[in-house]
From Swiss-Prot:
Residues in PLAC domain copies: 1655-1691
Protein known as: ADAMTS-like protein 3
Disulphide bridges, residue numbers: 87-118, 91-123, 102-108, 576-620, 580-625, 591-609, 831-875, 835-880, 846-863, 934-982, 1215-1263, 1321-1367
Start and end residues of each Ig-like C2-type domain: 896-992, 1185-1279, 1296-1378
Coiled coil spans: none
Matches recorded under InterPro entries: ADAMTS/ADAMTS-like, ADAMTS_ADAMTS-like, ADAMTS_CR_3, Ig-like_dom, Ig-like_dom_sf, Ig-like_fold, Ig_I-set, Ig_sub
Compositional bias of kind Polar residues: 1156-1169
Species of provenance: Homo sapiens (Human)
Domain TSP type-1: 75-124, 418-468, 478-535, 564-626, 703-760, 763-818, 819-881, 1424-1482, 1483-1545, 1597-1644
Impact upon substituting residue 855 to C: In a colorectal cancer sample; somatic mutation
Transmembrane domains' residue ranges: none
Signal peptide region: 1-26
Amino acid sequence: MASWTSPWWVLIGMVFMHSPLPQTTAEKSPGAYFLPEFALSPQGSFLEDTTGEQFLTYRYDDQTSRNTRSDEDKDGNWDAWGDWSDCSRTCGGGASYSLRRCLTGRNCEGQNIRYKTCSNHDCPPDAEDFRAQQCSAYNDVQYQGHYYEWLPRYNDPAAPCALKCHAQGQNLVVELAPKVLDGTRCNTDSLDMCISGICQAVGCDRQLGSNAKEDNCGVCAGDGSTCRLVRGQSKSHVSPEKREENVIAVPLGSRSVRITVKGPAHLFIESKTLQGSKGEHSFNSPGVFLVENTTVEFQRGSERQTFKIPGPLMADFIFKTRYTAAKDSVVQFFFYQPISHQWRQTDFFPCTVTCGGGYQLNSAECVDIRLKRVVPDHYCHYYPENVKPKPKLKECSMDPCPSSDGFKEIMPYDHFQPLPRWEHNPWTACSVSCGGGIQRRSFVCVEESMHGEILQVEEWKCMYAPKPKVMQTCNLFDCPKWIAMEWSQCTVTCGRGLRYRVVLCINHRGEHVGGCNPQLKLHIKEECVIPIPCYKPKEKSPVEAKLPWLKQAQELEETRIATEEPTFIPEPWSACSTTCGPGVQVREVKCRVLLTFTQTETELPEEECEGPKLPTERPCLLEACDESPASRELDIPLPEDSETTYDWEYAGFTPCTATCVGGHQEAIAVCLHIQTQQTVNDSLCDMVHRPPAMSQACNTEPCPPRWHVGSWGPCSATCGVGIQTRDVYCLHPGETPAPPEECRDEKPHALQACNQFDCPPGWHIEEWQQCSRTCGGGTQNRRVTCRQLLTDGSFLNLSDELCQGPKASSHKSCARTDCPPHLAVGDWSKCSVSCGVGIQRRKQVCQRLAAKGRRIPLSEMMCRDLPGLPLVRSCQMPECSKIKSEMKTKLGEQGPQILSVQRVYIQTREEKRINLTIGSRAYLLPNTSVIIKCPVRRFQKSLIQWEKDGRCLQNSKRLGITKSGSLKIHGLAAPDIGVYRCIAGSAQETVVLKLIGTDNRLIARPALREPMREYPGMDHSEANSLGVTWHKMRQMWNNKNDLYLDDDHISNQPFLRALLGHCSNSAGSTNSWELKNKQFEAAVKQGAYSMDTAQFDELIRNMSQLMETGEVSDDLASQLIYQLVAELAKAQPTHMQWRGIQEETPPAAQLRGETGSVSQSSHAKNSGKLTFKPKGPVLMRQSQPPSISFNKTINSRIGNTVYITKRTEVINILCDLITPSEATYTWTKDGTLLQPSVKIILDGTGKIQIQNPTRKEQGIYECSVANHLGSDVESSSVLYAEAPVILSVERNITKPEHNHLSVVVGGIVEAALGANVTIRCPVKGVPQPNITWLKRGGSLSGNVSLLFNGSLLLQNVSLENEGTYVCIATNALGKAVATSVLHLLERRWPESRIVFLQGHKKYILQATNTRTNSNDPTGEPPPQEPFWEPGNWSHCSATCGHLGARIQRPQCVMANGQEVSEALCDHLQKPLAGFEPCNIRDCPARWFTSVWSQCSVSCGEGYHSRQVTCKRTKANGTVQVVSPRACAPKDRPLGRKPCFGHPCVQWEPGNRCPGRCMGRAVRMQQRHTACQHNSSDSNCDDRKRPTLRRNCTSGACDVCWHTGPWKPCTAACGRGFQSRKVDCIHTRSCKPVAKRHCVQKKKPISWRHCLGPSCDRDCTDTTHYCMFVKHLNLCSLDRYKQRCCQSCQEG
C-alpha cells in the first residue's frame, strides 16, 4: 500500500481542489499547514468522485491494526485490511480510516474503506473550533480581489458538511469548499460528524453508526436508574414580614431543570459550590446567562418567570422567591436529580494463594458521586433503586507450586477447607436511654487454619457473603414524661378561686423517676370559677308589686365631651354599693375645657363652668334579696295617712342547716327606710312591731352517696419528691359502699406529692462491671459519682468535694486465681529468602498467668497435652528472575544517584584534615580542613555542583571543588557553618557542618547581611545543647579515675563497652564485638568518633542502663540522653524542600542505621525530572533571633516571633512572596480562619495588622498562599511579654538518707555528704528567661554544673559545697532572684550499724544483713534473734514526671529470712526507710484545673469558675502548656458551675438611683432587709443591720419647669382665658421628661383669665382671613362669626 503524504500537504491539496477561487491567488497562500488537524482521504482516492452513502462502511467496534483477512469476506477476493490511519483530529472526536484492495480487480463485493472514531476526549477550553480553523485557512487567500476574515456558518440544514463561511463585518456568505474535513461536526448540538462530505450518525458512545443516546440522567445508553424525577408545585408564602422564602433546592448534577413561578413574586437563585463559595443571582431581563459554569436561560412575562437549565448543574442551586406584591404566587418545578450515592464494583482482590489453585473475589462499594469517594454502605441503602451487585468469585493461580529445599508449599485452601466467615462482637450500649436509639457492633473476617486456629484475615476474603447487620434500633420505649394527676377541688364554693394538681415524671412502666425536662413541666395551679353566685338571687316579690321608684331602669345618659367652652364632664358611675336590695352609685363631675391649639383637655375650677352641676350620686337596685313566700303574707301594709318612716320587713332566710335529709332555715327581719328601702339600724324600728321568728324546712330530699377520704399515708421519700396516698371511697349515708359513678362530686385526690425540696448531695454507686479477666488477676470497675436529686426528679452531677463521707471504691481486683498453663508464640520471623520460596519461624513457650498478673514460664512438660501451634511456615516472595529484570529495568531508567552515608561525626581532638561523605552531620573543631566526598552513579563527576545554604559555591582561596566532585574547605571558621548540598542532575544530598568552640559549646553562625533562604526543619539559631553534652562527654572521657581512655585502657573499660553495646541483633558474634571495639579504639585515638544512627540508639539505651546501676548519676545521664536525642533526632534535610512540591524525609529514616544505602532525592524518585526549582508561590523567610521591641508599631515578617508589650499599639506581619505573582492569601489564628474585625485588619495582599493588641490576641498566626501551581505556608507566634517569675517554694527539707535529692529553690536543704543534689529553678516569663547561678561568698565548685532546664546539679557534695545558692532569671522585661541554703549531714541509711546486747555478748547489725559477734572468740553462732533488714521496694508513686519515688521499708526477719512481727524487733533501733526516685520521664498531656474561685456574687445566684488548661509535666519538673488539641476533648473538666447564696439585700428597683428626688440631682433610695434566720429577727444583731435609706446621685433629678408662650385669648370678645404649655425638662439635655421628676419644684400656672374687646362694639372683621372663612362656610361657628362679623353678615 502506498504511503500517504504529510497532513499539511493533504490539507493544501483539498483547499486548492475544492476552492472556487482563481488559481492565481494560490501562490499568495503558503498553505494551512499550521493546523493540527488534517484530512483523511488519501491522495488520488477513488472516493473523490463518490459522495453517495452507499460507498461507505464503518466498523466502530474493530480496533485492530493487524494485516489480517476479515472473517466477513466470503468471496475471499479481498486482501487484508490495512493499518488505521492517523486521526483527523487531536481532540474533540475525529475519524480514522483503513483500506483494503481487491485482489481480482474491480469484481469484489463490498467496500474497500472503513472508518472509526478516534481522539474522543474533549479539547482544552482555549482550543479553536475545528470548523472555524478551516474557515480561517482562507484568510490569506483573495476572494474576488479582497481579503476577508472568514467565520464559520453553522447548522446549515441543506448542506451540513459543506464549508460555508461568512466574511466578518460583511453580509457575505460563501461556500469555500464543498466538503469539510473528516471529523467535523455536522451541527453544534449533536455528535454527528462529516466523513467524505456526508453527515454520519455518531452515538453518545462516540462510535460511528451507533444509536446510543443519553438517558435523562446523562448516562450514555443508560436505563435512567442513576437519577430520579422530581416534580411538583408549591405555594410561595412571602409577605412584607417574610421577604424571602426557599422554594426548592436542586442539587449539583441535576438535569432538565425547569422552574416556573406564576404570580408577582420574584424568583432568583442562590448557588453553593463544593468548595463552599456562595452567590446570589437575580435577573430582571430575559436571556441566557452563565451561573457557576452552568448555562441558565431566564424567561420573563407579565405574571410568569421561568428558569430552564439543560444541565448538568455544576453547583447546588436553591431557588428562592422574594416579595414584590401582596398576591399569592405558585411555583412549579421539574428536574432529574442524580442519586448521590451509587454502587460500584471493585476490582478483584488478590488471589488467596500464589500457586496450587485459589480463588479471587470482588465486591461492591458505595461511592459518593459528588465527592467521588467511597462512603459506608448505608448511604446506598437509602435509595430503593440501588441494588447492590453480588460479589463475583473466580479461580486463580492454578499453576502447581514448586518445591524448594525439601519444603513444599502448604495450600491453605482446598475444597474441604471451610471458607472465611464473618464474626461479630457484642452490641454496644444504646445511644440513648429511651425514645429509640441505635447500637452498633463491629465485625471481622476470620478463617480456620489447618490446625483449628481461628485467625483474623482481610475483609475482602469474606466479601462473598453478606455483611452482618452492624446497627440496630434499641430502647424503643417512650422517654419519661410529665403526667398530671387530677385537679383538686376549687378553693372556694362560689365565685373565683384556685385549684391544684400533682405533676410527676413517669416512665413507660408507670414508675416515678427523674429525667424529664423541667422546662416542659405542666403547671400545677390554675384559676377556677364555681358557677354558683356568692348570693342567692331570689326575688322577694313580683316586679309588678314593687314601688315605682324600685322599678327604675338604667337611664341612658348623653355622653358629654369637652368643648372650647368650659363644661361639666361626668366620670363613669361606680358599681352599686350593694349586691341585693337598694344601694348607691357615685361619680365625679369636673369642669373641663378643650384647648384647640394642643387638642388636649385641661381641668378648670367649678366656677368657670356655667349651668347646674350634674348629680354625683344616685340610688341603685341590682335585685331584691332572698325571702320566702311566707314573708310576703306577713307584710303589714302601711296606712296611707301614716307618718311612720321606718318599718320591719323580712329580708330572706338564713342558709339551710343541712344539704340533704331535711334541714331548717330562719327568716331574717331587717329595719328598712320606707321611702328608700335601705337597711338601717334596728334601733330605728319599733321593737314591739318586730315580726315574729319564723322557720321553714329545707333540703328534704335524701342524701346522695358521697366521697369519704382517709388520712394521708407516710411520704415515700424524704427529699427530692415523694408521694403520699390515701383511701377514697364512695359511700351511702349509712356507710354502705356505692359505685363510684353515683358520687356526683369530683373525686378527691388519692395521690399527692410531698417533701418537694432538693436532696443534699450524696454518693451514687452503680453496679460492678464484669471482671476484665477470668483468671490471672483482673479488675472490676464501677462508677461512683457525687449526685444531687432535684425536686423535678432529675439528678445533678456535682464535684466529689461536695459529697459528705468517704467515697466508695470505684475498682477492685477479681479473678485472683492462677490460669491453667497455655502455649504462647512470638511473631513470625522475616522470610528466609528475598525472592522465591522460603520459610518463616517463630518460638513457642509454655507459661502461666499467675493470680497477680505475672507471666510465669513453665516446663514444656506442663503443656505437653495442649495442641501444638505451627512453628514453621512457607513464605512466597517475588520470583527471583522477575526481580532481577525489574531491577535492571529500573536501574536503566533511573537518573543519577548519590551514594550517601547517614552518619553522625563528632571530632574530639584537633586534626589537620578530615574526610566526610555526603549525607553526614558533622560537629568539628575550628581550623580543621575538611574534604566532603560526593560519590555518584550515572553522572559525570566534573559536572557536580555545590551549594551552601541555597547559594551556589565557586572556587576561592579557602574553598574549592575537585575534578572528582569533592568539596574542599581549608581552615574551618564560623562563616563555614551551614548546610552544604551536592547536586548531581536531579539527585541531591546534604551535609551539615557545625563547629565546637573552646568553651565546649556550639559556635553560633554570624548573621548574614543579605536575607538567605531557609530550609524547613533546619534551626540555624540552634541552642548550644550539643555543646553542653559534649562538655560532659569530654569530662567523662578525660576523667582518669572513671572514663579516661588512653592507649592501654580502651579495651578494658567496662563503661565504654557498655556504652557502645551491640548495634546488631543479639545473634551477633564475639568477633563483631571485638571489631567494633577496635573501631571505637581507633576512632578515639584519631580524635574523632563516628557512628551511624543505630549505634547512637544503642548508646542511649546503654546509658540508661548505667544510670539504673548507679555507675552514672541520674541527672548526668538524663542530661546526656536528652541533649543527644534532641540534637541528633532532628530531621536532616536531604534536598531542597519546597512546600507543596516535595515530601519531607521522615526523621525516623535517619535513626534506623541505614548505612551505606543508596540515597536519592525523594522528588527524583517520584518523578525522575529535574524539579528542585519551585513551581508554586514561595514565601520570603527571613529568620531573626527572637527579641522584644518596645516601639509602638512593630513590623515583622512571617516566620518570626512577635512579643506584645504595654507600649505596643500596632503589629504588622508581612507575608511576601520571593517572586511576586497572583495568589490567594489565607490567615488563621490557632487553626481558626481569621475574619476582619475592629482589631484585625486584612488587606488581602499578604499583610495583617493587629491594632491595640492584648492577651487575647496572642497565638499562632499562619499565612497560607496558594495559586494554581501550588501553595506555601508559614506561621508566626505572637506572645504577650512577661517579666520573669521564679516559682520558688519556701520550705525546709531534710533528707540525709537519700543518695539523690531534687528540690525546688527556696528554703533550707539538708542533705547527706556524698549525695547528688539537684536544685530546680522553675521560672515563668515570656520570652523564656535565661537562668544563671551564683554562690554567695564564693564561686561554684568543680562538681557543680548547670543542666539544660536551668537546674543546678551538685555531684558528690562535700563540705565545701555548703552555702547559699542564688538563682537569677532574666529577660528583656526584668529579673527575678531566689535562694536556697545547703547544709550537709552524715549519712544515715543504709550504712547505719545497729548494736544490741544479749547477755554478755554484743551483736552488730550492719546494712549488709550479716551479724558479727564482737566478744565470742569461739565463733559460736549468735542466738536466733530477729533483726531488721531492708524489705522490698514499693511501687513507684508516679508513672511519670519528676515526683516519682519508691520506698524500701525495713522489715523484721529471722536468721532464716522469715519475716516476723515488728514487735519482736522493738528492742532494736529501727533503721530509716530507703528512698529513691523512679519513673522520671515526660507525662502525656492532660487537663489541669485551678481551684474553684469564690462565688461570683456575695448573694443571690452566681457561679464558681476555674481555669482549665492542657499541660504536660516534663521529667525535669516543669509544666509545659500545650495546645488543647493535645488533650482528649471528652475528658475536659467543667470550667464553671453554679453557686447559690442567701437572697440579696437590694435597693428598690427602678433606675440607677430610683426614689423621690430630695433636691437638685439628689434622690432618696431605700431597700428592705430581713433576718435570714429561720426563727425570728431576734437572732440578728441590730448593730450590723444594713442601712435602709441613702441619698444617691441621679441625673434624672436635675430638672426644671419650662413654660411656653401664652396662646391667644379664647374669647373673641368679652371674658375668656388663655393657656400656655408647661413642661418638665432636663437642664442639661433640654429634653422633656416625666412630670413626676419636677414635683419638688413649684409648677407655673398653665392658664389665666383674659379679656377681649367689648362684645357690643361695631361689627367689624378682626382678622385678615375672613374672606376664607366666608368661602369655607365657617360663619356658623361662633368663634369665626365673632371675629369675622362684617364678612359673615354680608353673606
